[in-house]
C-alpha cells in the first residue's frame, strides 16, 4: 500500500486544503486564511466529509486569529475576543447544518475559550492562543481516532463477517470517507486500509455516489493512490453485485454525518438503499464514525434535518474535455445531462434506521445491539467520560 493521501495541510497558523472540486483530474491546494474562506469552501464542497469540515472550520479560525495576533489587530480584552470567536463559530456552523461534527466541534471550542476567558488575568491574546491550541489538538486527535476506527473495524470484519472458507474480505463502501473526508486515513475507508495492512483485503468496491460522484471522483482516487485492489460500480449495480456468487461481498462499510441516540444514521444519499439490500442478501452493514458524530441530543432519525442541494448537481456534470492535451493542463467543462425544465429533488443525505445496522465502528470499539435489539450509545459516553 502506498503512502496515505494528505488533503489538509496545516503548520504554524497556515492552512491549505486540496480542492476536491478539481479531483481526480487536478491536485490543487487552495489557501484558507479566514473563517469566510472556510465557509465558502465548505458550502461549495471544496472540502467535504463530516470530520474534515469540522477540522477545516476550526483551523481556518485559528489561522485568522494567528494573523490578527501577528499584525497586532486583536483586541486586548478577553471578553471581546471570546464574543468574536463565538460569532465566527456560529457562522461556520451554518455552512453545513447536517454534519454534527461541525456543531460539536464549535460547542467544544466555545466551551474551551469561555472557560479560559473567565480565568483571572486572561487577555484577548491568551484566549486566542487557547483556541488555536485546541483547534490544532482536534486535528491530531481525529487522525489518531481514525487509525483506531480502522483497526477496530478490520478486526470485527475478520471475526464476524467472513465465511469460514475465507481469510480475506471483500468490502463495499459508499461516498468518500477517507483522507479527503477527515484529517487523514479515514473512517470507513480507513477500515479498508486497515484490512489491507493486515493482508486481509480481497477486494474493495466503491459506488459512483450520484449525484456528486464522491465515489468515482474521490474514493476511486484514494484507492488508486494507495494501490488497493478495487472496482468502481454505479449506484444501481449494488443489488446485482451482492447477488453475485463471484463477488462474495462480506460487508458494506459506510461513514456517517450524524448518528442519533438510537443508532439511526444520516449519511450520503443512497446509504439507506444499501442497508436494505444488505439485509436482504445477508451482508453485514456497518457504520464507521468517531464518537463526535454521535448526537445524543437527537433521539432518532426523524429529528435529523436533511440538507437539500441545488438542482444543477443532478442536471449537470463537470469533467475534463476528452482529447489530447498536456498532462499538466486539464480543461474542465460543465455539461447538461438531463432534460431542461424537469423538476429535481436533491436531498444530500438519507437516514438509515438502526434496525438495518449490524454495528457502529468507533475509536473505542464496535458497538452492537444489546439483548433488547437496541443500540445504547449513551453508555459510550458514560464509560469514556465524553460529552
Curated annotation (Swiss-Prot):
Keyword Isomerase: yes
Superkingdom of source: Eukaryota
Site (Transition state stabilizer): 175
A Pfam entry, by short name: IF-2B
Any single GO CC term annotated in Swiss-Prot or TrEMBL for this entry: cytoplasm
Keyword list, A-Z: Amino-acid biosynthesis, Cytoplasm, Isomerase, Methionine biosynthesis, Nucleus
Pathway assignment: Amino-acid biosynthesis; L-methionine biosynthesis via salvage pathway; L-methionine from S-methyl-5-thio-alpha-D-ribose 1-phosphate: step 1/6
Subcellular location: Cytoplasm; Nucleus
UniProt keyword annotation of Isomerase present: yes
Gene3D superfamilies the record matches: translation initiation factor eif-2b, domain 1, Translation initiation factor eif-2b, domain 2
EC number(s) stated in the UniProt entry for this protein: 5.3.1.23
InterPro entries recorded: IF-2B-related, IF-M1Pi, IF_2B-like_C, Initiation_fac_2B_a/b/d, M1Pi_N, NagB/RpiA_transferase-like
Catalytic activity: 5-(methylsulfanyl)-alpha-D-ribose 1-phosphate = 5-(methylsulfanyl)-D-ribulose 1-phosphate
GO molecular function annotation: S-methyl-5-thioribose-1-phosphate isomerase activity
GO biological process, alphabetically ordered: L-methionine salvage from methylthioadenosine
Residue ranges of coiled coil: none
Active site (catalytic residues): 257
Subcellular location, principal: cytoplasm
NCBIfam families found in the cross-reference section: eIF-2B_rel, PRK05720.1, salvage_mtnA
HAMAP family, A to Z: Salvage_MtnA (MF_01678)
Function: Catalyzes the interconversion of methylthioribose-1-phosphate (MTR-1-P) into methylthioribulose-1-phosphate (MTRu-1-P).
Protein family according to the UniProt entry: Belongs to the eIF-2B alpha/beta/delta subunits family. MtnA subfamily.
PANTHER family for the chain: METHYLTHIORIBOSE-1-PHOSPHATE ISOMERASE (PTHR43475:SF1)
Name of this protein: Methylthioribose-1-phosphate isomerase
Gene (name only): mri1
